[in-house]
Amino acid sequence: METTPLNSQKQLSACKDGEDCQENGVLQKVVPTPGDKVESGQISNGYSAVPSPGAGDDTRHSIPAATTTLVAELHQGERETWGKKVDFLLSVIGYAVDLGNVWRFPYICYQNGGGAFLIPYTIMAIFGGIPLFYMELALGQYHRNGCISIWRKICPIFKGIGYAICIIAFYIASYYNTIMAWALYYLISSFTDQLPWTSCKNSWNTGNCTNYFSEDNITWTLHSTSPAEEFYTRHVLQIHRSKGLQDLGGISWQLALCIMLIFTVIYFSIWKGVKTSGKVVWVTATFPYIILSVLLVRGATLPGAWRGVLFYLKPNWQKLLETGVWIDAAAQIFFSLGPGFGVLLAFASYNKFNNNCYQDALVTSVVNCMTSFVSGFVIFTVLGYMAEMRNEDVSEVAKDAGPSLLFITYAEAIANMPASTFFAIIFFLMLITLGLDSTFAGLEGVITAVLDEFPHIWAKRREWFVLAVVITCFFGSLVTLTFGGAYVVKLLEEYATGPAVLTVALIEAVAVSWFYGITQFCRDVKEMLGFSPGWFWRICWVAISPLFLLFIICSFLMSPPQLRLFQYNYPHWSIILGYCIGTSSFVCIPTYIAYRLISTPGTFKERIIKSITPETPTEIPCGDVRLNAV
């Protein structure tokens, strides 16, 4: 008797009467050598309602010798799964709906034609963002591995994609959590009768501080600044103590304590795996929607709110003729849904094999897009109120972009409305919970990837590995906690992570659709869901989605953003530095390709064939066990 690898996922047979199938905790199909007599019946595939041929049939038939084998793990070795389906959905929604939905989408929408922007945004979502989102969920759920080891089952030569994703995740964690630290500082500062950014009588204020909402007659000059702006720049960031990237200054101990608290919450939320993080997101993923609803109702009742809504949605159809509008729409939907970061692969890998990931992709994508749209009303009703109070045009009030829109403009509006303390507390608490969800997801993507790749080292030491990851991210964040840390945050966001993750996602889409094969991928989906993806999805995966990513990358390279923060213009060398940081992650892909081709024995043609052929079987469920099949 001998065992041989499975030639097909369909060639599964049961051991005769279940005898001698178990060895060292693993079920094995005994395959006879030539001359042995074989009697076997096929078994149910375990996920289809239709029984396989021979299932439940007493008829026995012979099969060719040495054609099939079975290696199935016992049920107790099963991969961890989500406690409930809703845990997975809330985790994915919490990951996709982040701070960018609140500040980036509203700003980009009004800047690119208001209501007219929804047309390119919807088109890019349908043909680019959602197909990539669906692809990653299906890949993760079928192969049940993180972003590194999954490539052994798809196309081994592209394993460098997984390492690149892990490095990108580290860069993101280095600056993203700093924004949460700012929000936490604001939250702590909000527990006062009078919010500290409402007046110019504080120690950090300058002679240029001018309060728009003061009862005194005021004169606004070119150099005038609001109390909210000075609180953000001079008290929270202390950016006046830095001369720029060439001299960042010291570390703000207040922000360092805030980020330590943030990382502590993160650690105890994810240290035990998806069983614990899946429960935490019941709070962190739902709380923002409660607060958004409260803020929406409050904003709609403010005087002048209609001015903000009109400014937000009034369509400028001429904008649709500008290429930049379509670029912004494509970039926004991609970074909002978040394919290419390894998170969707990790989350989906903990699903049950026959979970309807197609439905999940559609539901979570729609929820994400609708959240962005509704967030625009939350922001612009308040901006309309500010414009009414200042007797200015909304465009003058809404000139701030990025974090400044939240920490200066919106914070100032909250400070000058009734019950300001209450609304400030819930608003900044909402920002923190939005950020926590995304950080949980980003780090889980890395943790799952490393644990799956090195199970013999870390499988029983997850808590220690998570601690090491969190500590590493904390030390990586120190440069963003300096007095000039805001300059670093903007540089990392614009240059170090954006282009890199776009390129990684493009190569991933090509590797799956062209090398692994769209036909094989669709077969995998059919085995899970019972139906094959239609032609729309196939065309998107093979051509439209890769072109969608290539379009964004080329547009970025042809017209890179000019960096400016407050009154500081970034030096030219900083752009080169940003590209170098981004390249440091992407370089993992060609480096691993070269390593693979050099280390694989055989002729050059044989090396290529071996390198693009899956080398590890994928487990297929069969009743109470999982079957390994090639």
UniProtKB/Swiss-Prot annotation:
Glycans are attached at residues 208, 217. Na(+) 2 binds at residues 96, 98, 101, 336, 368. Pfam families: 5HT_transport_N, SNF. Phosphorylation at Thr-276 increases 5-HT uptake and is required for cGMP-mediated SERT regulation. Keywords: Antiport, Cell junction, Cell membrane, Cell projection, Disulfide bond, Endosome, Glycoprotein, Membrane, Metal-binding, Neurotransmitter transport, Phosphoprotein, Sodium, Synapse, Transmembrane, Transmembrane helix, Transport. It comes from the Eukaryota. This is Sodium-dependent serotonin transporter.
